[in-house]
A protein has these predicted regions:
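Short, small-residue-biased leader/transition segments that mark boundaries at the very start
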Residues: 1-8
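Loop/turn positions that initiate beta-strands
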Residues: 9-10, 116
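Generic structural signal for buried aliphatic residues
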Residues: 12-14, 119, 156
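Conserved, well-structured core segments that form or line functional sites
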Residues: 19-25, 36-112, 118-130
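Short acidic-glycine loop/turn motifs at beta-strand connectors
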Residues: 20, 158-162
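Short, compositionally biased
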Residues: 25-41, 132-147
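A structural signal for short hydrophobic beta-strand segments in well-ordered beta-sheet cores
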Residues: 31, 155-157
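A conserved acidic, glycine/proline-rich C-terminal tail/linker
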Residues: 101-109, 122-152, 173-174
């Protein structure tokens, strides 16, 4: 945190990038500090559901737009907005590479997925508007309306059988 202290009832996103044998991995997870407000817990839960629903559509022959459509639909159904300023990305021996993975959009559009494609899905879901602002430090991002936001992320590989979640945690199953 830049210039602030954690307080009971805050939520925190920890985003971790690793390089192993020349290959990058990228993941993030939300944490609650103490007992949080029910509306913040719900935001974090729905954001995680957005990620999981997006992972379910990943397979050879699917389109990148399918990812954005399912995220946008689930967020909107729960009265949240999807940040459009940031997106997932291709990943491999280069940390950020093509394709861009939008978290909004139309099913059946965009790049068609093929076996071997590796990328991240990392939806940022807001309680209020989708708009964000970058603070003077040039790094910290906040929502324009000051309401809460949540983000979860995984690195994926498209396989012949569907998808492998390369950053799967012990408490998850896909």
């Amino acid at each position: 945190l830049v210039g602030s202290e954690m307080c009971i009832r805050d939520s925190l996103n920890i985003d971790v990038t690793v390089i192993r044998n020349g290959w990058h991995g990228d993941t993030s997870k939300m944490f609650m500090v103490g007992k949080t407000q029910p509306h913040n817990e719900r935001l974090v839960k729905v954001t995680q559901e957005c990620l999981y629903k997006a992972i379910e559509v990943v397979k050879p022959g699917a389109y990148m737009g399918d990812i954005g459509a399912v995220i946008q639909e689930h967020a909107s159904k729960n009265h949240y907005s999807v940040v459009e300023d940031y997106c997932g990305h291709g990943i491999g021996q280069v940390y950020h590479e093509d394709p861009q993975v939008l978290h909004y959009g139309k099913a059946g559009t965009g790049l068609r997925m093929e076996e071997g494609l590796c990328f991240t899905i990392e939806p940022m879901i807001n309680q209020g508007t989708k708009y964000t602002k970058i603070l003077r430090d040039g790094w910290t991002v906040e929502t324009q309306d000051g309401r809460n936001s949540a983000q979860w992320e995984h690195t994926l590989a498209v396989t012949s059988g569907g998808v492998e979640v390369l950053t799967q945690r012990n408490d998850e199953s896909f």
